[in-house]
Amino acid sequence: MDPLTSALKVSASGLQAESTRLRIVSENIANARSTGDAPGADPFRRKTISFAAEVDRASGASLVEVERLGTDDSDFNIEFDPGNPAADEKGMVKLPNVNILIEMADMREANRAYEANLQTIKQSRDLISQTIDLLRASQ
């Protein structure tokens, strides 16, 4: 497989991985204040994602794949809010272990990586097009 096609495959795998990462971050942000459905029940638990390199046999290129989707087992945040329906008998409410600042940083990083992969695809496509034009002109 030629290097330009390999670059397209690598970038496409990066796009898929970052798209999944953005979805996970979005779910975490959307549920950052979700409490349990009963007093004392556990709230939403932050989701995590990890990536791994996979070698494409046809091209020998290292592709990115989602290795694992998991949950963050860190402690929940606890807040005193006796009026909350999810509050226990002491008025304490368990809140998700989601830190909005971390999620926003993850989102920006994933967005930049997504844009970089898009740019690589565009440049590879342009190079392929220019190569075809040169081959046509030489005939």
UniProtKB/Swiss-Prot annotation:
Coiled coil: none
Protein name (database record): Flagellar basal-body rod protein FlgC
Recorded GO CC terms: bacterial-type flagellum basal body, rod
Gene Ontology terms describing biological process: bacterial-type flagellum-dependent swarming motility
Quaternary structure, from the entry: The basal body constitutes a major portion of the flagellar organelle and consists of four rings (L,P,S, and M) mounted on a central rod. The rod consists of about 26 subunits of FlgG in the distal portion, and FlgB, FlgC and FlgF are thought to build up the proximal portion of the rod with about 6 subunits each.
Species of origin: Rhizobium meliloti (strain 1021)
Family: Belongs to the flagella basal body rod proteins family.
Keyword terms, alphabetized: Bacterial flagellum
Compartment(s): Bacterial flagellum basal body
Superkingdom of the source species: Bacteria
